[in-house]
A protein has these predicted regions:
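Sec/Tat signal peptide C-region and signal peptidase I cleavage site
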Residues: 16-21
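Bacterial N-terminal signal peptides
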Residues: 5-15
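Short, solvent-exposed mixed-charge patches
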Residues: 156-159
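Membrane-helix boundary connector in multi-pass membrane proteins
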Residues: 105-114
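N-terminal secretory signal peptides that target proteins for export/translocation
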Residues: 1-2
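Alpha-helical segments in soluble extracytoplasmic regions
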Residues: 23-95, 101, 117-153
C-alpha cells in the first residue's frame, strides 16, 4: 500500500507542471524546473572530466522527453494559431534538440563530453524560459489547420 501511495504522489508531482494555464506556461515551468536537474547532472559530469561519466538519471531522461513532447505540441499549437514561423520553428527545434542532447549525454565516453551535452541542454532550457511567454499573446486557434501546417521551418542550427 505504501508503494502505491508513493507512486501516486510521484505521479501527482510530475503532473503539476501540466496544470499550468497554457501550454506555453507548461513549457516554461517545465524548462525552469529542468534547469536545476540538468545543473546537478552537469556538475557531476564536470567533476570527472576524463573519467567515464555517470549514466543519465532515468528521472532526468523522462522529464527531458516530456519537455520535448510539450515543446513539439507548442510548435503545433503556434502553427494552428497562425503564429510567427520563428516561434514555431524554435519550439520544434527545442523538441529535436532535447532528444539529441539527451542521447549525447547518454553515450558520452567522458565526463567532459557529457558536461558539454548538458551545457547545450542548459542553454536551450534557458531559452525556453525566456521565449515561452511570447507565445501567450497569439490569436485564437485557426480553423484551417492544413494551411498552418503547410509552413516549413528553415534550415536547423546546431547549438
Amino acid at each position: 500500500m505504501k508503494r502505491f501511495a508513493l507512486l501516486f504522489v510521484l505521479a501527482l508531482g510530475t503532473a503539476l507542471p501540466a496544470s499550468a494555464d497554457t501550454l506555453a506556461d507548461q513549457v516554461r515551468a517545465e524548462a525552469a524546473r529542468l534547469l536545476a536537474q540538468v545543473n546537478v547532472a552537469s556538475n557531476a559530469a564536470k567533476a570527472r572530466p576524463a573519467e567515464r561519466p555517470q549514466p543519465v538519471a532515468p528521472a532526468l531522461s523522462a522529464d527531458m522527453q516530456r519537455f520535448g513532447l510539450a515543446a513539439s505540441r507548442l510548435s503545433v499549437e503556434i502553427d494552428q494559431r497562425g503564429g510567427p514561423t520563428d516561434l514555431r520553428c524554435i519550439f520544434r527545434g527545442m523538441s529535436e534538440e532535447a532528444d539529441k542532447q539527451l542521447t549525447a549525454a547518454a553515450v558520452a565516453k567522458t565526463g567532459a563530453d557529457q558536461a558539454q551535452a548538458y551545457a547545450r541542454l542548459t542553454h536551450m532550457l534557458k531559452d525556453a524560459v525566456d521565449i515561452a511567454p511570447a507565445v501567450g499573446g497569439l490569436p485564437p486557434k485557426q480553423t484551417d489547420a492544413a494551411k498552418a501546417s503547410a509552413a516549413q521551418c528553415p534550415a536547423t542550427r546546431n547549438f
